[in-house]
């Protein structure tokens, strides 16, 4: 989530040169860091490679997915990654194998100074119909549990795995009034870890709602929750 005022920093948007995807072998895919997660899942499906189905439900790109170890329905980027190619602050192109990446829940511990160029992934041969059916089922699960086709913050807070067995949505539900809003920023009725832009919510509206929820959960439950999304201001 980025400020709608001036941002005192540098934002790099990778061009179409980083949007390529191809097979390296029967079960290995190489994808540019600007390739969307959905496109990667579709490419894997078209080549009868399983293991990528969960990516069809994740918005964003390969680069961002690796950086935060994005995942859903029990699967994460670390489960399919072989290695990444990146460029350092000094301009050196390096390859980092997955075994050297300290993946955690929604984190990779990779340096913020790295710019990801591409990544290689390993799947396994699987019947095309089975892949399609799994993707359909995952999509149904997502649409039942999460707000879709509307403007939201996405999954906003991480589950506090080191503090409680409760999911973050459960903590929010018991700590924050469901009708709480700031401007046009409000809590989704379908999943309270998703915050909705009802029409014209500003950055500040959404930020205030996020901060209010975080403080309310801490006050009510004693659990300190951390944002899953990155906030740039």
Residue ranges and their predicted role:
Residues 28-32, 56-65, 100-102, 132-141:
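Short N-terminal helix-initiation segments at or just after the protein's N-terminus
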Residues 47, 51-82, 88, 152, ...:
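A gly/ser-rich beta-alpha-beta helix-loop segment of oxidoreductase catalytic cores
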Residues 20-24, 86, 157:
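A structural signal for short hydrophobic beta-strand segments in well-ordered beta-sheet cores
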Residues 1-19, 67-98, 111-118:
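Structural signature of FAD isoalloxazine-binding scaffolds in flavoprotein oxidoreductases
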Residues 87-211, 215-216, 220-233:
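Phosphate/pyrophosphate- and phosphate-bearing ligand-binding catalytic cores of soluble enzymes
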Residues 1-62:
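Anion-binding (especially nucleotide phosphate/pyrophosphate-binding) glycine-rich loop
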């Amino acid at each position: 989530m980025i400020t709608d005022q001036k941002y005192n920093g540098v934002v790099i948007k990778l061009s179409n040169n980083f949007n390529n995807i191809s097979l390296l072998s029967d079960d290995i895919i190489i994808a540019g860091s600007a390739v969307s997660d959905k496109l990667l899942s579709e490419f894997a499906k078209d080549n009868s490679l399983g293991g990528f189905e969960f990516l069809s439900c994740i918005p964003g790109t390969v680069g961002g997915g690796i950086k935060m170890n994005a995942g859903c329905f029990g699967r994460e980027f670390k489960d399919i990654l072989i290695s990444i190619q990146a460029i350092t602050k000094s301009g050196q192109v390096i390859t980092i194998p997955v075994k050297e990446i300290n993946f955690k829940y929604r984190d990779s511990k990779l340096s913020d100074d790295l710019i990801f160029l591409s990544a290689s992934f390993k799947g396994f041969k699987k019947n095309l119909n089975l892949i399609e059916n799994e993707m359909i089922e995952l999509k149904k699960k997502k649409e039942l549990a999460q707000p879709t086709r509307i403007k939201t913050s996405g999954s906003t807070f991480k589950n506090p795995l080191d503090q409680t067995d409760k999911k973050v949505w459960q903590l929010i539900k018991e700590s924050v009034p469901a009708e709480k809003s700031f401007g046009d920023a409000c809590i989704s009725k379908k999943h309270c870890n998703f915050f909705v832009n009802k029409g014209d919510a500003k950055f500040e509206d959404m930020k205030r709602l996020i901060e209010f929820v975080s403080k309310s959960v801490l006050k009510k439950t004693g659990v300190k929750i951390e944002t899953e999304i990155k906030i740039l201001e």
